[in-house]
Amino acid sequence: MTETGRTSKYRVEIQQMMFILGEVQDPLPETTQLVEELIRGQVMEMLIQANELALRRGSRSITVEDLFFLIRHDRAKVNRLKTYLSWKEVRKKAKEQDANPADTKDLFEEVDSKTRSMNAVAMPWEVKNMFTEPVPETEEFEEDNDTMEMAYATRQRLKMADERTKKMTREEYVHWSECRQASFTYRKGKRFREWCGMSILTDTRPDNDIVDILGFLTFEIVATLTEEALAVKDRMDRIQNSSGSGGSHAAHHPKNCSLFDGLTEGRTPLQVSHVLEAFRRLQIPDKTHTAMRSFHGGLVKSRVYLI
């Protein structure tokens, strides 16, 4: 039970997600609770903004395009979401064809076509969709900058995971694999709706696809917040070590540090201050996506920026 009286609903899932992203196996309870409250606020803000977009369109229902519009400035995240939706559709088709093994060849061909056309989801606000005639696509545009940016971010996470799992025992890797399956929405749709107050913030009940997308974006928020908090902690530790107040460098950074060593081998968990500083940094608006006010003056309403 928290200080505000709200019971944590995703403590275990958040611990598992933070663990695979670089945190120690057992984060501090107050840190986990803070992360849950922050991401809950982010999901609620996402629902509010998506509902406003739907009302502007004259609709009461949130669509997939509304959620895409909210993250349109993060091109790498947009492409990861497109990939997620493409493979989600493939898995759905695979379940439908389980009873007919003769269609396996067609399924593989569909998987290949889905992979090639995962970025073909039409977004009305994109320039290429503003022409009456479709822009012809060639091989030169198959791997654009957005796809390369998405691939780079994915490779960085895979590289970190490879380094952390390289010296694991079988039991440790089994635990790691179980943590990688953590989800906010898989078989937890009802809990997720209650957790973020979906029935209060939306006019109609969003379908399961919207809930799955929100679950994917919620994991992305946890990943971004955890990675930024670890960067803050690393910087603070280096400043402390360089000033001599934190002891020798070797004491805080042992050469042979296992993933499961925890506090006994010098690995310390994230503190609340690290998460708060990371959230503060992530709330600084990107100047490239900020409109000029032309010095008209007046009060500027503060808002929560989506991570």
UniProtKB/Swiss-Prot annotation:
Keyword check for Transcription regulation: yes
InterPro entries, per database record: Histone-fold, TFIID_TAF13
GO cellular component, as recorded: cytosol; nucleus; SAGA complex
Pfam families: TFIID-18kDa
Keyword terms, alphabetized: Activator, Nucleus, Transcription, Transcription regulation
Keyword Signal belongs to the record: no
Localization in the cell: Nucleus
GO MF term set: protein heterodimerization activity; transcription coactivator activity; transcription coregulator activity
GO biological process, one term: transcription initiation-coupled chromatin remodeling
Gene3D superfamilies registered for this protein in UniProt: Histone, subunit A
Subunit annotation: Component of the 1.8 MDa SAGA (Spt-Ada-Gcn5 acetyltransferase) complex, which is composed of 19 subunits tra1, spt7, taf5, ngg1/ada3, sgf73, spt20, spt8, taf12, taf6, hfi1/ada1, ubp8, gcn5, ada2, spt3, sgf29, taf10, taf9, sgf11 and sus1.
Function text: Component of the transcription coactivator SAGA complex. SAGA acts as a general cofactor required for essentially all RNA polymerase II transcription. At the promoters, SAGA is required for transcription pre-initiation complex (PIC) recruitment. It influences RNA polymerase II transcriptional activity through different activities such as TBP interaction (via core/TAF module) and promoter selectivity, interaction with transcription activators (via Tra1/SPT module), and chromatin modification through histone acetylation (via HAT module) and deubiquitination (via DUB module).
Family to which this protein belongs: Belongs to the SPT3 family.
Protein name: SAGA complex subunit Spt3
Species of origin: Schizosaccharomyces pombe (strain 972 / ATCC 24843)
